């Protein structure tokens, strides 16, 4: 059984995926550009800059994510998880306003409000463009997701509890 969780930067995707995996006793698969940045010893901004002109970064992240996900039951958390993990037992998409996402990124990483807002908006636009170009995926169309949750005003534990209730309601065992 695989559970796929997606959402834009700052929606709670990484945190919710990790908590969900922990609560269900499943491995977490969350291999992202941040992992590549750490592995290469460069900043996330530099990886994003390189990804603008080099499809290798997206393809490497997505191939690694899928390879890890196919090994066993797991929670997969990534921007494209609900699109790429086609056999997921549950596909969850997390939402939050740009203002809320910026607030969360600031809490997590610090910085200037205007810089973070500009960076987040730019990243959203670039992600959308790359996903359309590489995979013909419109990441603003998540209508096929089994569960769409607005995480604004919700703590992560509440979001995880809602997802677990959905699993139970569907009779999905873990």
From Swiss-Prot:
SUPFAM superfamilies assigned to the protein according to its UniProt record, in alphabetical order: P-loop containing nucleoside triphosphate hydrolases
According to its UniProt record, the EC number is: 2.7.4.25
Tell me where it mainly resides: cytoplasm
Tell me one GO biological process term.
pyrimidine nucleotide metabolic process
> What catalytic activity does the UniProt entry give for this protein?
CMP + ATP = CDP + ADP; dCMP + ATP = dCDP + ADP
Q: What class of enzyme is it?
A: transferase
Statement: the UniProt record of this protein carries the keyword GTP-binding? no
The protein's UniProt keywords, in alphabetical order, are:
ATP-binding, Cytoplasm, Kinase, Nucleotide-binding, Transferase
Q: Which Pfam families match?
A: Cytidylate_kin2 (PF13189)
Which is a Gene Ontology cellular component entry for this protein? cytoplasm
Return the InterPro entries for the record: Cyt_kin_arch, Cytidylate_kinase_dom, P-loop_NTPase
- Could you tell me where this protein is found in the cell? Cytoplasm
**Amino-acid positions noted as binding ATP in the UniProt annotation, renumbered to this chain:** 7-15
* Recorded GO MF terms: ATP binding; CMP kinase activity; dCMP kinase activity
Q: Which family does it belong to?
A: Belongs to the cytidylate kinase family. Type 2 subfamily.
* Name of the molecule in the record: Cytidylate kinase
Q: Which organism is it from?
A: Treponema pallidum (strain Nichols)
